[in-house]
Regions:
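Amphipathic alpha-helical assembly/interaction segments
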Residues: 1-123
Length: 123
């Protein structure tokens, strides 16, 4: 797969991740205050992954690219935290959470590798 294809594939994948977060939030019972509050935090972090990846795609320098990719990783990690809290403290089923958590984990691994490779090639 060429670099442009990988870039477009990851762009699509991060957008799909954001969409899965939105659909997950829409399925929550917003009458429960804790679900509404944590769900909104999850929406912010989960959609931020896609937004920051798009910004990274348009970076003007290696340093800017690395900074945005690192933000993607951080936001995906934060999304995992909110998902864990929803499962462990709010009783949301693993069946609902695990696929999204796993995708966040895979994205984190990709972003960490991208960041390391960019830093190595830049030094």
């Amino acid at each position: 797969m060429e670099a442009a294809e990988r870039k477009n594939e990851l762009r699509k994948r991060t957008k799909e991740f954001a969409g899965s977060i939105i659909r997950f939030y829409m399925a929550l019972d917003k009458k429960r205050e804790e679900l509404r509050v944590i769900g909104k935090q999850l929406i912010r972090s989960g959609t931020s992954v896609a937004a920051n990846y798009r910004e990274a795609s348009r970076a003007r320098s290696s340093d800017e690219f690395t900074a945005k990719i690192d933000l993607c990783s951080q936001e995906a990690d934060e999304s995992q935290l909110w998902l864990e809290l929803l499962r462990e403290e709010c009783g949301i089923s693993s069946e609902m959470i695990d696929p999204i958590w796993s995708e966040a984990d895979q994205l984190i691994r990709i972003f960490v590798t991208m960041s390391k490779n960019t830093k190595r090639n830049h030094d």
